[in-house]
């Protein structure tokens, strides 16, 4: 073989190796880029749910404040008149407001009156004693809590619940305070499904003690981000995210979980 031919072949081989290296490198960075995009996308989905939940809690706070800062409620805490009950604590109030409980407490935190409603069965039910105990033990109402509003999530025997607690004042926001008003609803499957209608993928909620939050997620691909978000991939088809949800005391209390199709990643493979 002539020297010129050998040099040409060597040159072509070198060019091929360079092109191949560039292709492999470009493909690597492209896949890395698509992985980052899909991770950011699912984290944004998590944040979107948290914002929707925050908006939901804000609406609950407004509703509870409207009732708590109201002359009729203020008078009711003095005489517990039947007219107030018949006019306000009716089934339609719970159904239209999406509420499971409306509870009244004396200034010292003692339970005074309340009603509970099963939205799925569309009927009144007894107020869970465990819920009253949770509210009182956590000091969401009573002395020291009456001067402020509290809105957020608590974990109950019946599951996660969104609650708002406000002092009971006159319509002009004068006292003396006659107790606390608490309104709340369970974050059950139906309510979560309703929130998920505004999101690209559904969300599930678990307590911190529930191992089901990570069930079926490949542990070998699971990565933690500041102990607030965990992301894992399942082949080229699915990406999962588990994220922390704080309670009313701004402490870790629940896990949220989302799963999305890896269409962005598969696009990078083509």
Roles of regions detected by a PLM:
Residues 58, 70, 75, 93-180:
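Extracytoplasmic/periplasmic ligand-binding sensor regions of membrane-associated signaling proteins
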């Amino acid at each position: 073989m002539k020297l010129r031919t050998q040099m040409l072949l060597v040159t072509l081989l070198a060019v091929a190796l360079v092109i191949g290296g560039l292709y492999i490198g470009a493909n690597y960075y492209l896949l890395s880029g698509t992985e980052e995009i899909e991770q950011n996308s699912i984290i944004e989905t998590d944040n979107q749910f948290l914002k929707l939940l925050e908006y939901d809690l804000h609406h609950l706070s407004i509703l509870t404040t409207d009732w708590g800062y109201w002359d009729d409620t203020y008078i009711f805490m003095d005489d517990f008149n039947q007219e107030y009950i018949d006019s306000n604590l009716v089934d339609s109030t719970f159904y239209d407001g999406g509420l499971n409980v409306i509870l009244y407490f004396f200034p010292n935190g003692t339970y005074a009156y309340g009603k509970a409603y099963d939205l799925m069965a569309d009927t009144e039910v007894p107020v869970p004693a465990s819920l009253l105990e949770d509210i009182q033990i956590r000091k969401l109402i009573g002395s020291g809590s009456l001067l402020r509003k509290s809105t957020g999530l608590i974990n109950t025997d019946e599951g996660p619940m969104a609650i708002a607690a406000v002092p009971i004042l006159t319509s002009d926001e004068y006292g003396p305070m006659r107790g606390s008003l608490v309104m709340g609803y369970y974050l059950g499957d139906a309510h979560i499904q309703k929130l998920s209608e505004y999101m690209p993928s559904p969300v599930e909620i678990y307590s911190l003690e529930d191992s089901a939050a990570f069930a079926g997620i490949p542990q070998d691909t699971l990565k933690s981000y500041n102990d607030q978000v965990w992301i894992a991939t399942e082949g080229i088809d699915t990406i999962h995210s588990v994220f922390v949800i704080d309670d009313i005391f701004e402490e870790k209390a629940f896990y949220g979980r989302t799963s999305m199709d890896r269409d962005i990643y598969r696009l990078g493979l083509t």
